[in-house]
Amino acid sequence: MAERRRHKKRIQEVGEPSKEEKAVAKYLRFNCPTKSTNMMGHRVDYFIASKAVDCLLDSKWAKAKKGEEALFTTRESVVDYCNRLLKKQFFHRALKVMKMKYDKDIKKEKDKGKAESGKEEDKKSKKENIKDEKTKKEKEKKKDGEKEDSKKEETPGTPKKKETKKKFKLEPHDDQVFLDGNEVYVWIYDPVHFKTFVMGLILVIAVIAATLFPLWPAEMRVGVYYLSVGAGCFVASILLLAVARCILFLIIWLITGGRHHFWFLPNLTADVGFIDSFRPLYTHEYKGPKADLKKDEKSETKKQQKSDSEEKSDSEKKEDEEGKVGPGNHGTEGLGGERHSDTDSDRREDDRSQHSSGNGNDFEMITKEELEQQTDGDCEEEEEEENDGETPKSSHEKS
C-alpha cells in the first residue's frame, strides 16, 4: 500500500505530458534508430542515448522560428529535455548484461568435442589410406592443378567466417537518469504509426464492402467475377509451369543419364520477388564424369602442341632458306672485294650490296654485280693487251 501511494505521488508531481513533449517523443520514437531484444521475458525496443541526441539536434525543434528561440541549441539542452521525458515514463534506462554459459552447457560442449575428436581420428586414418592410393595419380593432376589455380584466381575469394556476436540481455537500471553516451534506454511509449492506421482502415472498409457484395450493381459484380476468374487462371498457369518444369528436368536427366541438369525458370518457386522469379529463363549444368573432361583437355593440348610444332617447322624452313641465300651473297661480295680492293668505287658497291641484302633484294643485286664484274674484267683485259702492245714498240725505239 505504501509503495502504491508513493507511485501516485510521483505521478502527480511529474504531471501529464504536454502536446509538445508528445510530439518530440513521437518524432524520436519513429526516427531514432532502434533495435529489439528480450527483457524480463518480453520483446522490447531500445535505443542508444548518443543517437537520440543527434536525432533531436537534426529535428525542426533545433531551428529557430520567427520570434521564438530554438528548443534544442546544444547537446546539454537535449539531455535535459530527455530527462524530462524519462521522468514522464516515455522510456527508462536499462543495463546490458552478457549471457553466461551454464555448467551444463559447458559439459555438453566438452562431450561433443570428445566425440568429434574420435570421429576425426577415424577420418584421418581413412584419409591416409586413400592418400597412398592417390600418390600415383598426383603426377597427372599437376597439369590440371595449374589450370584450376588460374581459375581460382579469377573467381571471387571464399567467404569469410561470420563473426559470432555476443548475446546479451537487458535488465532495469537502478539509477534512472539520461546520460549522453552509449547508455541503453528501452521504449515504453508506443504510439500507433500513421501508416498502420491507414492500412487498418483500408482493411476494415474492404471487409465491409465484401459483405455488401449482393447489393453491388450488376456491372460491378460481373467485373469482379471476370477478375476473379483471371486471377484463378493466372495461379493455375503458375502451378502448371512448376509441374511442367519438373517433368522437363526429369526427361532430360533420364535421357542423358544424369549428366545434364536443365531447369526452366529456376527461380519460379524460390523466395524472391515476382519479377525475379522469372529470371533467368533457364539454367544448364553438366555433371558428367571427370574422365570425359580429361580426354577433352588432353585432345585440346595435343592440338595446341601440333599447331606449335607446325609453326616451329615453318619458321625453321624460312631460316634455312635465308641461310642458303646469305652465303651466296657473301661469296660474291668476297670475290668482288679481292678483285677490286684497291679502288674506292668497288668498296662503295660492296656497302650497297650489303645494305640491299638486309632489305631482302639479294637476288637483284647479285645479277647487277655479276654484270659489273664482267664489264670490269673485259676492261682490264683490254688494258693489259694495250700495255703488251706498247712494250715492244718502246723496245724497238730504244734499239
Curated annotation (Swiss-Prot):
Q: Does the keyword Transmembrane helix apply?
A: yes
List where Gly residues composition bias occurs: 325-335
Q: Which residues carry this modification: Phosphoserine?
A: 341, 353, 356
Which ranges does the record list as Cytoplasmic topological domains? 1-196, 256-399
Q: Where is the composition biased (Basic and acidic residues)?
A: 108-155, 289-324, 336-354, 390-399
Which Pfam family, just one, is annotated for this protein?
Sec62
- Where is the segment annotated Disordered? 108-167, 289-399
GO aspect biological process, one term: post-translational protein targeting to membrane, translocation
Q: Which GO terms describe its cellular component?
A: endoplasmic reticulum membrane; rough endoplasmic reticulum
Query: Membrane topology type, per the record?
Result: Multi-pass membrane protein
Composition-biased stretches, type Acidic residues, lie in: 372-389
Instruction: Topology check: give the Lumenal ranges.
Output: 218-234
Location comes to:
Endoplasmic reticulum membrane
Q: Which residues carry this modification: Phosphothreonine?
A: 158, 375
Q: Which residues cross the membrane?
A: 197-217, 235-255
UniProt keyword annotations, A-Z: Endoplasmic reticulum, Membrane, Phosphoprotein, Protein transport, Translocation, Transmembrane, Transmembrane helix, Transport
- What role is this protein assigned? Mediates post-translational transport of precursor polypeptides across endoplasmic reticulum (ER). Proposed to act as a targeting receptor for small presecretory proteins containing short and apolar signal peptides. Targets and properly positions newly synthesized presecretory proteins into the SEC61 channel-forming translocon complex, triggering channel opening for polypeptide translocation to the ER lumen.
Fill in the subunit field for this protein.
Answer: The ER translocon complex that consists of channel-forming core components SEC61A1, SEC61B and SEC61G and different auxiliary components such as SEC62 and SEC63. Interacts with SEC61B.
Entry similarity comment: Belongs to the SEC62 family.
What is the protein named? Translocation protein SEC62
